[in-house]
């Protein structure tokens, strides 16, 4: 991993580089647990949040993944290299924060479902003030949002993904939700 030392709340915090994100989504999604999402606000203040819950969405074959319907203007960022943000609106009211993984033209993404003290993907983006303006932002070189490795280990649990009945039983039952307590 290309890591750059960053001052933080944790004994050693390291900014995560591109090679972390260009791996398969089923490797990256659990590896994101206990990583630190860092957000720099317009006033210069910086907040750090530990990731506690993720879900993997694995390309055009995954019926729950937005890319299952092919390449569109909405999903274009999913076809870019890992480390970019894919942000979209659901139900006309909640922004969803996803991190693109894999290589170019491998549309995979990890939904950030929870942070320490914030459970649920809509609550996460609302609490952090995240919206479409960060769609396509690159976590490896952005000065507004990035990830750090806290060096902390977690007991990671799995379960089927949430809220994807439309994808059918096969895809709904995949244990691609990762979380810790």
Language model features with spans:
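Conserved, well-structured core segments that form or line functional sites
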Residues: 2-181
């Amino acid at each position: 991993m290309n890591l750059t030392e960053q001052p933080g709340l944790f004994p050693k915090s390291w900014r995560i580089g591109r090679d972390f994100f260009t791996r398969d989504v089923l490797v990256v999604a659990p590896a994101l647990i206990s990583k630190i999402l860092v957000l720099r606000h317009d006033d210069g203040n910086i907040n750090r949040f530990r990731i506690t819950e993720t879900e993997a969405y694995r390309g055009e074959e995954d019926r729950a993944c937005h890319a299952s319907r092919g390449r569109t203007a909405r999903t274009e960022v999913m076809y870019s290299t890992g480390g970019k943000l894919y942000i979209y609106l659901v139900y006309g009211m909640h922004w969803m924060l996803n991190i693109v993984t894999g290589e170019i033209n491998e549309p995979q993404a990890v939904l950030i479902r929870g942070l320490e003290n914030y459970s649920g993907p809509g609550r996460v983006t609302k609490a952090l003030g995240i919206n479409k303006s960060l769609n396509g932002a690159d976590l490896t070189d952005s000065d507004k949002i990035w990830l750090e490795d806290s060096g902390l280990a977690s007991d990671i649990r799995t379960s089927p993904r949430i809220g994807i009945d439309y994808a059918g039983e096969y895809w709904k039952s995949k244990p691609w939700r990762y979380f810790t307590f």
